[in-house]
Amino acid sequence: MYANKVKKIAAVHDLSGMGRVSLTVVIPILSSMGFQVCPLPTAVLSNHTQYPDFSFLDLTDEMPKIIAQWKKLNVQFDAIYTGYLGSPKQIQIVSDFINDFRHEDSLIV
């Protein structure tokens, strides 16, 4: 059996088209370190929120669907990383996600 399995990280964050932030930065950095990054996007933004104006596509209603599919696949994560959460409902979804997917050795960031 292959003993050195690739560690999986769930990255709960937005995807911003401009600004060198969020999933556009996290995925390549963690991937280059040898991790499999599994994004759970919270929103898609045209650019990060420090610009004076931005477009925002809320993915709150999609998050439980993605999580349900991961449960069906019996996915296990070695770490769960959270970034931008756009609403109190997303905070609850992520709290439940962490409770459902964490295990004794999980790193929660």
Where are these regions (language model features)?
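Ribokinase/PfkB-type carbohydrate-kinase core domain
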Residues: 3-11, 15-19, 25-109
